Amino acid sequence: MESAARELRGVLIQELKQLEKVRTYDELRTQVNDIAVMLAKRMRDAIIDDMDFAFRNGYSSAYGEIKGINKTAAKAPDLKPEDIEVLRLLKTEGALYNAYNQFQNILVEKMNATIMAGIAQGSSIPEIVQNMRQVGIGETYKLTRIARTEITQIANEGRLRGYKRAEGRMGIQFKYSLIIGKDTRTCPAHQELDSRIPSSGMYLNDLIMLQQEVGSKYRMNLRGHSLLHPNQRTSLVRIV
């Protein structure tokens, strides 16, 4: 995601540099939508690719951690249809889905506002384009930041699926925990969750029930099994 975002910022800079050559404000406005459509499509494609990779890599790496399982191949078995359905839902709902769907409209709106402000201030076209560039880079950064935290959640969901597949093959239940970031950005809900998970871990259903209890107390919008809510640096792990 980070490399794709850097590449797109470079593309944005080049596209806007060409706009410095236009002669009228009307011509400048007509180019905004085309640039926004191009950037939105490329951002969406990069995000979808990263979501798919994060889920599948989480699944295969979690399954591969399990020792003593009768593995018939060097890699994890193929995803089950229900796993693929979970991945499909993760791609079509939630904060990241909303963010990349709104990206194009927000970009068009803010770039047009920048043009109108520049006209009102009597700015030259190159000056307006410079301000448009900052808007585009800023919006790309915001979407990348949302994607970073949401894709962590998707990787956790993949890990959960890998662990559950191994549980089924071995006929036993594992214990799990959450590695939760501990700094000033950690919300009270996660602080409480961290303090209530025993060092020996918890069976999955018990961990889910604890998350639901804490989430309800703090009025969190729970999504998925492995995170309390998306805006935390939290990873699902199996306790050995």
Predicted regions and their residues:
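N-terminal leader/targeting and assembly helices and adjacent pre-domain segments
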Residues: 1-137, 239-240
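Residue-level detector of solvent-exposed, low-hydrophobicity positions
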Residues: 62, 66, 70, 104-110, ...
